[in-house]
A protein has these predicted regions:
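Active-site substrate-binding loop specific to GH73 endo-beta-N-acetylglucosaminidase modules
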Residues: 2, 66-68, 80-87, 119-353
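Cell-wall polysaccharide-cleaving catalytic domain and substrate-binding groove, primarily
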Residues: 2-56, 147-151, 159-160, 172-175, ...
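Short, compositionally biased low-complexity segments
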Residues: 13-22, 56-59, 75-78, 164-168, ...
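N-terminal accessory alpha/beta regions
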Residues: 15, 27-133, 206-207, 218, ...
Length: 516
């Protein structure tokens, strides 16, 4: 049976949780149970459904969108934060959808940072491009990102003119965005830069309400022929003149790159590391990467069929791969909120609550070394580009901060607006088949919380030393029955709630909770 063959067996609870952990920022128990029993083919159709186009981010003071307003230096920091909070809110509220996980993949692939671009309206506009193309055609995606105003700013494409070519984008287009190191030469970088001369952005930090868009200036374009190396079979892109020269030559450049078999392999490897595992062995390369790269090439570089094949494959559902990825700060922090059904308020009727909650989440992400829309380099976040180093998310500092985040949730000390960010352990216990039975309670919680199985000694410790703190196990049964016989009694509710809360806090601190 080939690794890429479709897995057609209805999903178990653990398999459904595995799919949802990898394809979203984390499932709720209800979503796990909803997907259990479905075939992967049915499940992926739900995940691939196109969500409604989100409303743009708003200024927290006026609650009005700012993407079409004139630039305002005094509000730039506020708008930058509002754009980040807007996207975090979409991640939290996304439901069982692949979209936001794919948008993050592409934002970390086609890196343009808010700090460098320094115009929140540009970064928001780019995010709309990322989500529009997230599961579309890769060729069209590369072409549009090449001309994207934020990208032109970030990699200096707007400074690339005839006679004074800027090679930044021509290099990253090949090294990071399409084909990878070792598959082009320095002369190819120079030739690509000449192809790309003449593009510039309009509307940057404009104090009038002009459109943010891209313009091709024919007079700044290199009209001579561009000769590429043997890596590209000595292709010549003929120099053009006139208003269509930029688009024509850009299309030929992208076609030349994508005609190389390595381009499809390069992208499938990145998708593999994002969704499955960082370790690509020779066997995986031959039996998984190469077949899916052929699907990508033969499908004219359509993204959706490749992602579908990957997420429904026999290999994806290999039990050995569950828990093989360390959660990013987003997967940990947002995933925990999503698991407990905590949603982001609407920023328009409740700007204070929305801003306070998103600021809290963003601060936790940043201190755990993931600043959304602001990667440290053009390579993206190191755990994704430094092959095999997902564990870079965790060190002695960030591990303590991860634990602090979940401790704050169980303590219920974080407020946003008029609400408190708190988990409800009693409600979570009631979702198990028999919360009065400590064995069933811990077993079912563990199955929902963790990507890998706990040992029996771990389960026993959670029951005997954490939940009931050294008492006989029947004591928990009695305490739960006492509570349910008088559920409005605050003292009885507090008694079980405190024990469940302590158990949650301990489970969050287990190494297994850091894995997905």
């Amino acid at each position: 049976m080939a690794l890429t063959d479709p897995y057609r067996t209805p999903l178990t609870l653990q398999q459904a949780a595995h799919l949802l952990r990898r394809a979203t920022f984390g499932p709720s128990p209800a979503q796990i149970k909803q997907f259990a029993g479905q075939t992967p083919q049915a499940a992926i159709q739900t995940l691939l459904a196109t969500p409604a186009t989100p409303a743009p981010p708003v200024d927290p003071t006026t609650t009005k969108p700012f993407d079409t307003l004139a630039f305002d230096t005094t509000l730039q920091g506020t708008w930058q934060n509002a754009t980040k909070y807007w996207w975090l809110g979409l991640m939290i509220n996304a439901g069982a959808s692949l979209r936001e996980k794919m948008v993050l993949f592409w934002q970390n692939h086609f890196v343009s940072t808010a700090a460098v671009v320094a115009d929140a309206r540009y970064i928001y506009r780019q995010n709309t491009v990322l989500r529009r193309h997230a599961l579309g055609n890769f060729r069209s995606f590369v072409i549009e990102m090449t001309k994207d105003p934020a990208m032109l700013r970030y990699l200096n494409g707007n400074q690339n003119v005839v006679g004074k070519p800027n090679e930044n984008y021509g290099r990253e287009l090949q090294e990071l965005f399409t084909i990878g190191v070792g598959n082009y030469t320095e002369d190819d970088v120079k030739a690509a830069a000449r192809v790309l001369t003449g593009w510039t952005d309009t509307g940057y930090r404009s104090t009038t309400t002009v459109d943010i868009t891209t313009t091709f200036k024919a007079a700044q374009h290199d009209t001579t022929d561009k000769v590429f190396s043997a890596a590209y079979k000595n292709t010549v892109i003929k120099g053009r003149t006139g208003s269509t020269a930029g688009d024509t030559e850009l299309g030929e450049l992208v076609d030349m790159i994508l005609a190389q078999p390595e381009a499809a392999r390069f992208m499938v490897r990145k998708l593999y590391r994002w969704f499955i595992n960082a370790d690509i062995t020779a066997a995986i390369e031959a039996n998984f990467i190469e077949p899916l790269a052929q699907v990508f090439r033969q499908g004219n570089y359509e993204i959706k069929p490749v992602v579908t094949a990957l997420l429904t494959s026999q290999h994806f559902f290999d039990d050995a791969l569950r828990g093989s990825i360390v959660k990013s700060p987003l997967e940990l922090n947002i995933g925990t909120l999503r698991f407990f059904g905590i949603t982001a308020p609407d920023a328009v009727p409740n700007p204070t609550g929305f801003t306070q909650l998103m600021a809290f989440v963003q601060a936790r992400n940043v201190e755990q070394q993931l600043n959304i829309m602001d990667q440290p380099t053009v390579f993206g976040w190191r755990p994704y580009y430094d092959t095999g180093f997902y564990d870079l998310w965790i060190n002695s500092t960030t591990l303590a901060l991860r634990g602090s985040f979940t401790d704050q949730l169980t303590a219920g000390t974080v407020k946003f607006g008029t609400e408190k960010l708190a988990l409800d352990p009693v409600a979570m216990a009631k979702q198990t088949t028999d919360p009065s039975d400590p064995v069933k309670l811990i077993n079912e919680w563990a199955a929902l919380f963790f990507a890998t199985d706990l040992t029996q000694s771990q389960r026993d410790f959670l029951i005997d030393e954490v939940l009931i703190d050294g008492l006989p196990r029947y004591e928990w049964n009695l305490e739960w029955q006492t509570y349910t016989s008088d559920p409005t009694n605050k003292n009885k509710l507090m008694a079980v709630s405190m024990k469940l809360n302590t158990t949650l806090q301990y489970m969050f601190r287990l190494a297994e909770y850091q894995l997905c």
